C-alpha cells in the first residue's frame, strides 16, 4: 500500500471546504445514528461509537466529497490503513494482507 503513488488534482481550497462540511455533518443527528451501532463499516468490528471516525469512501484528495453517500463510520485502525485509497484499491489491499 505504501508504494502507491498518485497525483491529486484537487485544490487545497476545495479540500478545506469539504473538510468543513464533514465537520458540520459530524454534529448532525444523521451521523449520530450512523455511529450508534459502534460497528466499523469496513472490518465489521464492534469498537463503540466513541471509537469510530468519519471516512470518505472516495477520499477528498481523489475527488470525493463530504456528502452522506460518501461518508461511513470506521474504526481508527481501518481509517489509518485506508488513507487515500479508492474502494477497489482498498478491497485489493485487504485481499493481500
Residue ranges and their predicted role:
Residues 2-42:
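Short, charged surface segments at domain edges that flank catalytic/cofactor-binding sites
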Residues 38, 52, 73:
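Cys/His-enriched microdomains
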Residues 42-43, 77:
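Short, cysteine/histidine-rich loop/knuckle motifs that typically chelate Zn2+
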Residues 49-50, 81-84:
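Short, non-ligating residues that shape and space the ligands of small metal-coordination modules
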Residues 53-59:
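Histidine-centered catalytic micro-motifs used for acid/base chemistry in nuclease
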Residues 63-81:
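Short beta-strand-alpha-helix junction that forms the catalytic/metal-binding core
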Amino acid at each position: 500500500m505504501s508504494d502507491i503513488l498518485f497525483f491529486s488534482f484537487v485544490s487545497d481550497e476545495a479540500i478545506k471546504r469539504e473538510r468543513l462540511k464533514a465537520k458540520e455533518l459530524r454534529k448532525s443527528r444523521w451521523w449520530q445514528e450512523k455511529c450508534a451501532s459502534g460497528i466499523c463499516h469496513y472490518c465489521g468490528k464492534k469498537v463503540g461509537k466513541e471509537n469510530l471516525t468519519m471516512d470518505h469512501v472516495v477520499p477528498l484528495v481523489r475527488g470525493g466529497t463530504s456528502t452522506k453517500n460518501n461518508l461511513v463510520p470506521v474504526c481508527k485502525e481501518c481509517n489509518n490503513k485506508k488513507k487515500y485509497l479508492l474502494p477497489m484499491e482498498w478491497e485489493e489491499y485487504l485481499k493481500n494482507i
